Amino acid sequence: MRHRHGYRKLGRTSSHRAALLKNLSISLIEHGKIETTVEKAKELRSYVEKLITVAGKNDSNAHKAVFAALQSKEATKKLVNEIAPKYVERAGGYTRIIRTRIRRGDATTMAFIELV
């Protein structure tokens, strides 16, 4: 049973799941809006919102923590300098998930996840 489990496995190993979330979060930060499956979007929401909260502190330790999670200089710079300052006054809820369509190949529900 998966009661109170805490996260979705997404059918991947832990390292693959970590890489997936890292790559999705980099894409979301760079583009502001991406389309993915609903399950991935829900996991990504948690991951990205924690990063934005850390980046909002706007000190060197926050910068290092965000870079450690993303491993992308461009995405880190954009998150710390452009995105996080917009959400300093906001207490969470930095992303929005909008269900879009059912994917033709496997009939899974797709969704847009975007920064609010």
Swiss-Prot record:
| Matching InterPro entries | Ribosomal_bL17 (IPR000456), Ribosomal_bL17_sf (IPR036373)
Keyword list, A-Z? Ribonucleoprotein, Ribosomal protein
Q: Which GO terms describe its molecular function?
A: structural constituent of ribosome
Which SUPFAM superfamilies would you find in this protein's record? Prokaryotic ribosomal protein L17
**Subunit comment for this entry?**
Part of the 50S ribosomal subunit. Contacts protein L32.
Q: Does the keyword Ribonucleoprotein apply?
A: yes
GO annotations of cellular component type: cytosolic large ribosomal subunit
HAMAP family given in the database record: Ribosomal_bL17
Lineage, highest ranks first: Bacteria, Pseudomonadati, Campylobacterota, Epsilonproteobacteria, Campylobacterales
Task: Please name the source species.
Answer: Sulfurimonas denitrificans (strain ATCC 33889 / DSM 1251) (Thiomicrospira denitrificans (strain ATCC 33889 / DSM 1251))
Spell out the family assignment given in the record's similarity comment.
Answer: Belongs to the bacterial ribosomal protein bL17 family.
One Gene Ontology term of the biological-process aspect is: translation
Name the chain's protein.
Large ribosomal subunit protein bL17
Listed Pfam families: Ribosomal_L17
